[in-house]
Structure formats: structure tokens, C-alpha cells
UniProtKB/Swiss-Prot annotation:
The lineage of its organism: Bacteria, Pseudomonadati, Pseudomonadota, Gammaproteobacteria, Vibrionales. Associates with collided ribosomes, but not with correctly translating polysomes. This is Ribosome rescue factor SmrB. Residues 1-20, 41-60 are annotated as: Disordered. It comes from Vibrio cholerae serotype O1 (strain ATCC 39315 / El Tor Inaba N16961). HAMAP family: SmrB. The keyword Transferase does not apply. The keyword rRNA-binding applies. Keywords: Endonuclease, Hydrolase, Nuclease, RNA-binding, rRNA-binding.
Length: 186
């Protein structure tokens, strides 16, 4: 036997062999249908911006949880609308009254229903906590006194509200409240 005897020789070129292989394969799989994949469920691709919006809405509704219409905190009837938690010094309330704290966030509630106002108030508090805003101004207006009466009651129930006071004239006077919030340490 010579060296060349065990070598296989082809009469056709490699391209012809490849074409034959493909045609044989096609003949064998003719009539086969693709199986539908049903074991792995792929989550739809979500836009990161949509995730952020959903998270913000969830945080706002979580903060809305604190606002009950049934609970009546003890607020003084004399003088301007004001409130301070027991662990907040009177000096802080005085600084709010004088306008020493300048609000970084303003919420205008004019024309809102009570439910919209609760939701927006919760969203504002969530935003302030997220952005480390210590003072905010809530403009409830005067109108029929519905929001003017309820906003202080809602704010007094929230655990992150340290104090609030009727705003000085430059921030809305009798139709607004300056709110002092506790910022969590990181």
C-alpha cells in the first residue's frame, strides 16, 4: 500500500459537496414546524425612565398612607396655623414664622380635589426626602377652606414632618404653610 491509497479522493469539488449536504438536510427536515418556546418567560424590556416614574408614584402613594381624614391631631385654634412635634424646639417654629427657612420646593394646590391634594402632598414629601430638601411651601389657598383645614391635619400625621407654620406674606401668607421636614442621615 502506498501513502496515497488511504486518502479519499472526490470527483466533485468541495462546493458541490456542500451543496449536496444542504440539499440532503433540507429534504430530511421538510415539513418540520418550529416549536413554540413555552418554558421560559421573558420579561418585557422596560424603559429605565418608566421604572423611575413608577417608583416615584409608589413612594408618593406610600406617603399618602399617612393622611387620614378620621384622625384629628391637636392643633391650636388661636393665632396662625402652626404645629411642632414634641422633639422640635420652639426656636425652629419661630424661625419658620419669620421666614428664616427659605423653601426649596413649592406645591400649589389651587383647584385640586382632596384626593389629588393628598396624592400631591405625599409626592412632595417623597421628593423632599429623596432630594434632601429641608423646607417646603404648600400653597393650599383660602377658597372654601376645605384644603386650608385639611392640609394641616394631614401634615401633622406624617412622621417626617417636624413642624409647619403659616407662611410669611412673601411665600403666600394665610393661604400657605411652610413645612420643615426631617432629612434622614445617610
Amino acid at each position: 500500500m502506498s501513502k496515497n491509497d488511504h486518502r479519499i479522493t472526490h470527483n466533485k469539488s468541495d462546493k458541490d459537496n456542500l451543496d449536496d449536504d444542504f440539499s440532503l438536510f433540507r429534504d430530511e427536515v421538510k415539513g418540520v414546524k418550529k416549536l413554540r418556546q413555552d418554558t421560559i418567560l421573558h420579561a418585557p424590556n422596560r424603559n429605565p425612565k418608566q421604572k423611575e416614574i413608577r417608583r416615584t408614584e409608589r413612594e408618593a402613594s406610600d406617603n399618602d398612607f399617612y393622611f387620614s381624614d378620621e384622625f384629628m391631631p391637636h392643633l391650636t385654634d388661636e393665632g396662625p396655623t402652626r404645629y411642632a412635634r414634641s422633639d422640635v424646639s420652639k426656636y425652629e417654629v419661630k424661625r419658620l414664622r419669620r421666614g428664616v427657612y427659605v423653601p426649596d420646593v413649592f406645591l400649589d394646590m389651587h383647584g385640586m380635589t382632596q384626593q389629588e391634594a393628598k396624592r400631591e402632598l405625599g409626592a412632595m414629601i417623597a421628593y423632599c426626602l429623596k432630594e434632601n430638601v429641608h423646607c417646603a411651601c404648600v400653597q393650599h389657598g383660602i377658597g372654601k377652606h376645605i384644603l386650608k383645614q385639611n392640609v394641616p391635619l394631614w401634615l401633622a400625621q406624617h412622621p417626617d414632618v417636624l413642624a409647619f407654620h403659616q407662611a410669611p406674606l412673601e411665600f403666600g401668607g394665610d393661604g400657605a404653610l411652610l413645612v420643615l421636614l426631617s432629612i434622614p442621615e445617610k
